[in-house]
Structures are given as structure tokens and as C-alpha cells.
UniProtKB/Swiss-Prot annotation:
Organism: Shewanella piezotolerans (strain WP3 / JCM 13877)
Keywords (A to Z) from UniProt: ATP-binding, Glutamine amidotransferase, GMP biosynthesis, Ligase, Nucleotide-binding, Purine biosynthesis
Protein name: GMP synthase [glutamine-hydrolyzing]
InterPro entries tied to this protein: Class_I_gatase-like, GATASE, GMP_synth_C, GMP_synth_GATase, GMP_synthase, GMPS_ATP_PPase_dom, NAD/GMP_synthase, Rossmann-like_a/b/a_fold
Gene: guaA
Positions contributing to ATP binding: S235, G236, G237, V238, D239, S240, S241
GO molecular function: ATP binding; GMP synthase activity
Gene3D superfamilies: 3.30.300.10, 3.40.50.880, HUPs (3.40.50.620)
Pathway given in the UniProt record: Purine metabolism; GMP biosynthesis; GMP from XMP (L-Gln route): step 1/1
Stated role: Catalyzes the synthesis of GMP from XMP.
Length: 525
């Protein structure tokens, strides 16, 4: 079995919104990489022993006092280094070049760079050819400051009309800098540039692929767990489902899954989970029907943050009770993924505001004396999905839209009641069914229905009735950090509205949410 961690790239994060995208692109190429904060020590870098280092972008100005710098060891480690945007600027400044502050002449968005000098980074890459016969590349820029003087030993590789050093290289030391962002899809040849860096310049093998990751994970799980038993909270979501399948492959029936039906799931979801994992895949599952317990705990509570905390607390209580029945279990499995690990490391800086409490944070009881098994903690979400497919999980389940941990608890606005959840489940199922029928489901990033605790007058036949209102929500987004409302066709929205009002007794009005993020969040609570 090849060692999937033998060849690796270290990415240093200076705060760019694109940094995780760089890591995902390197992984897609087939090379393992990790994302660390910029202020790491020489000892940590030596311990990781990367084959190459990428200095990512960031929002700061290299010209400002106390702005971040790469550790000096980066340039003495004897491995190739690629600086992207801010990473190029700090590389230039730290190695003796100069950076000037942009005054009204930054480049933001599409640009075309002209390649002046051959470079291993741009080998056999071009989008067009200039009048003078030089390669042109379509790229994505996002910078105010720029390099005004490159360090000794470097050559200018590419430029634009306003940026004299759009790319630079010291081929002897294998140091490269690009002012644009090769990791975003708008840079058409960006993936090939990153391939040149990771595979050709750094000499990495492309061993990081789903089948190898599964093989490696199964071996590591067997070694970690031995003959012990493991319990897992199975929600039916992507992460816990893939953890269940990996553990089942590694340790078979030594895995016990606890599936807690909190009454806040989608239509028929509990039955689907039991059918797939219990009947089809043959996993040991304890099914806990806890609808009343969750609803009773939330009775009278309208505050979204409090509802989230109650849902989390009741889940922990139930899971704790069930785990004590599994007396032989020595390990607790969790679906922690790599962005959770990055977020936890990053949150230590204390710079981010709390927008919403994350339903996985807050944890299980301190007195739960179980070891932790986290087989997905190195993986991004797209990698988890690919592994799920390889393990035999259905595509529709792995690629369905995100569903919040508290479920309908945060899609029923205000107090949560069984009547509201039942109506919402039916309305949401119609919306999703119609999206699939119209071939629109995969064209939006997330779609769902929200229950509004207001009654609205409706006309049915000759009579009037006061019934509930639901809102349809559909958004388009790349990263869920920002989102546009989806411009669904009017006739489609009309069809969904008619079906909901005519087929569900208790709903008299359907509205469509046309708020973007920001200022609104994607979920209503």
C-alpha cells in the first residue's frame, strides 16, 4: 500500500477567503496538503517535512507595520515555495524586493497577463497569444498593493498593463510568485499551474485518491481500535454516514450506531436511515424515537440560540444514556472534518464574531470515558462525498443540499410544535420534489421551506379560513459565505405554491424569500 502522506505540501494561511480553496485544489491534483497559520515555528515545519510550501493570500498590506510574514525558515528549508497574491508580496519583501501600496490602481477581477519568460510553473500553458507572439493567460486578480522591485536572483515571468510583476521566479531555488489567484476557476489554467508546482517542481506523486484514502483509513482504524467496540451517533447526514461505512468496513459488527429521531427530520427520513443502514448495509443500529422528549424540552422557547442549545443538550443526554447501555464500547466515533479542525485552530485567535453557535460544538459530557475516533478529520467535504460514493452510498444522499444540525428546529420560526413540524415536512417535500422534476435541484446550492408562525386569510370555495404561511428559500453560492437568491421561474414557483396550498390542509399562503447573504443569512434562524 502506497503511503498517501509521504509526499505533501504545506500551505501557510495569511487570512485569504481563498486559502481553503488552494488546499482543495492541491488535494484534487492527488497530493496531500495541510493548512497552517502563517506564524508556525521552524520546528513545526521541520516536523511536517513538506515537499513544497505555498504562501497563500491575505487581506493585510505588506507595507503596514506588524503585518504577517512567512517564517524565515520557509526560504531556507531547501524546498520549492510558491507565493500567491499576498504570499508573493511577502516573499518579495522578505527576500530583498520592494512592495508599494496601491493607491486607486489595484486590480480586482478578470485580467490578462502576458508571459515574458519561460518558467517551469507556466510550462506549455497559454490561453491566447499576443501580437508579439507571447503567451497570454486569463487570470483572476484581487490586489491593491503590488511588487515594485523583485529580489536579486528573480526574473519577471509575466506582467499586465498596470502590474509590472504579475509573476516572478527564481528557477535555481524553485521560488515562484504569482500576483493572481490560480486556485479560483476564473484563472482558466490555474489547476495546471498548481499541477506543475506540486507534481513537477516539488516532485510529489499523485497518491491522494479515494480508494487509497479508504485503504489508509481502514488500516489506521484497525490499528487504533484493535478488538474494542465503537459507538457512533448516526444522523443520516453525509459525515456520520461515511464514518459509519468506514468503521463497518474496518471493524464490522463491533460498531454500534445510535440513531436519534428527534422529530425534527425531513419527511420519511428516519425510515430511510433505518432501511439503508440497517436493512441494506447490515449495520447494528439502535433507533431512539425521541420526538416527544425534544418537543417537550423546547416547549415555550422561541429564541433561536436557546433552541439550538436545547436540541444539542437533549441529544447529548440521550446519547449518553444509550452509550452506557453499550458497556463494552471503548471508543466514540465522530464525523469531524478538516474545515472543523482548521476552524478550531483559527478560533483560538478570537477574531471571529459568533454568528450562530455550531450544533457540533459544546460536545459530549466530560465524564464520558471514551477514546475519540475521527476518521474524516483530514478530509474536506467534497473528499468525504467521493469516499462515500466509493463505499457504496447513494449519490442522491451524498449530494443533497445541506440540512442544519438542529433540523426543523431552526426552520420553524419561534416556538416549535409538532403541528408546525408536520406541516413544514409536507411543504418542504413538495418543494424538493418539484425541484427534482424540473431539473432545478442541482442548479441551486440549497433549497428548503420555512414555517412562519403567522396566520393569513385564505379563500377556499365560498368560505374564508385563517391558516399558516410558509416561505420557500433557494440560494446559489460557491462557498456559503455569501449567496444570491435563486431566480427560479415564476411558473415553477406558482406550481409549487398551488400544490402546497391545495394538498396541505393548514397552509393558506406561500411566499418566496428574495434576500441575499449578506445582509440576510441563508437559514432564517
Amino acid at each position: 500500500m502506497s503511503n498517501i502522506h509521504e509526499h505533501k505540501i504545506l500551505i501557510l494561511d495569511f487570512g485569504s477567503q481563498y486559502t481553503q480553496l488552494i488546499a482543495r485544489r492541491i488535494r484534487e491534483i492527488g497530493v496531500y496538503c495541510e493548512l497552517w497559520a502563517w506564524d508556525v515555528s521552524e520546528e513545526q515545519i521541520r516536523g511536517f517535512a513538506p515537499n513544497g510550501i505555498i504562501l497563500a493570500g491575505g487581506p493585510e498590506s505588506v507595507t503596514a507595520d506588524n503585518s504577517p510574514r512567512a517564517p524565515e525558515y520557509v526560504f531556507n528549508a531547501g524546498v520549492p515555495v510558491l507565493g500567491i497574491c499576498y504570499g508573493m508580496q511577502t516573499m518579495s519583501e522578505q527576500l530583498g524586493g520592494k512592495v508599494i501600496q496601491g493607491v486607486g490602481e489595484g486590480e480586482f477581477g478578470y485580467a490578462q497577463v502576458e508571459v515574458q519568460t519561460e518558467s517551469a510553473l507556466f510550462k506549455a500553458i497559454e490561453d491566447a497569444v499576443s501580437e508579439t507572439g507571447k503567451p497570454l493567460l486569463d487570470v483572476w486578480m484581487s490586489h491593491g498593493d503590488k511588487v515594485s522591485e523583485i529580489p536579486d536572483g528573480f526574473v519577471t515571468v509575466a506582467n499586465t498593463e498596470t502590474c509590472p510583476f504579475a509573476a516572478m521566479a527564481n528557477e535555481d531555488k524553485k521560488f515562484y510568485g504569482v500576483q493572481f489567484h490560480p486556485e479560483v476557476t476564473h484563472t482558466r489554467q490555474g489547476k495546471r499551474m498548481l499541477e506543475h508546482f506540486a507534481l513537477d517542481i516539488c516532485g510529489c506523486d499523485a497518491n491522494w485518491k479515494p480508494s487509497s484514502i479508504i485503504e489508509d483509513a481502514v488500516e489506521r482504524l484497525k490499528k487504533q481500535i484493535g478488538d474494542d467496540e465503537v459507538i457512533l451517533g448516526l444522523s443520516g447526514g453525509v459525515d456520520s454516514s461515511v464514518v459509519a461505512m468506514l468503521l463497518h468496513r474496518a471493524i464490522g459488527d463491533k460498531l454500534t450506531c445510535v440513531f436519534v429521531d428527534n422529530g425534527l427530520l425531513r419527511l420519511n427520513e428516519a425510515q430511510q436511515v433505518m432501511d439503508m443502514f440497517g436493512d441494506h448495509f447490515g449495520l447494528n443500529i439502535i433507533h431512539v424515537d425521541a420526538e416527544n422528549r425534544f418537543l417537550d424540552a423546547m416547549a415555550g422557547e422561541a429564541d433561536p440560540e436557546s433552541k439550538r442549545k436545547i436540541i444539542g443538550h437533549v441529544f447529548v443526554e440521550i446519547f449518553d444514556e444509550e452509550s452506557k447501555k453499550c458497556a463494552n464500547a471503548k471508543w466514540l466515533a465522530q464525523g469531524t472534518i478538516y474545515p472543523d479542525v482548521i476552524e478550531s485552530a483559527g478560533s483560538a485567535t478570537g477574531k471571529a464574531h459568533v454568528i450562530k453557535s455550531h450544533h457540533n460544538v459544546g460536545g459530549l459530557p466530560d465524564d464520558m470515558e471514551l477514546g475519540l475516533v475521527e476518521p474524516l478529520r483530514e478530509l474536506f467535504k467534497d473528499e468525504v462525498r467521493k469516499i462515500g460514493l466509493e463505499l457504496g452510498l447513494p449519490y442522491d444522499m451524498l449530494y443533497r443540499h445541506p440540512f442544519p444540525g438542529p433540523g426543523l428546529g431552526v426552520r420553524v420560526l419561534g416556538e416549535v410544535k409538532k403541528e408546525y413540524c408536520d406541516l413544514l415536512r409536507l411543504a418542504d417535500a413538495i418543494f424538493i420534489e418539484e425541484l427534482h422534476k424540473a431539473d432545478l435541484y442541482n442548479k441551486v446550492s440549497q433549497a428548503f421551506t420555512v414555517f412562519l408562525p403567522v396566520r393569513s386569510v385564505g379563500v377556499m370555495g365560498d368560505g374564508r379560513k385563517y391558516d399558516w404561511v410558509v416561505s420557500l428559500r433557494a440560494v446559489e453560492t460557491i462557498d456559503f459565505m455569501t449567496a444570491h437568491w435563486a431566480h427560479l421561474p415564476y411558473d415553477f414557483l406558482g406550481r409549487v405554491s398551488n400544490r402546497i396550498i391545495n394538498e396541505i390542509d393548514g397552509i393558506s399562503r406561500v411566499v418566496y424569500d428574495i434576500s441575499g447573504k449578506p445582509p440576510a443569512t441563508i437559514e432564517w434562524e
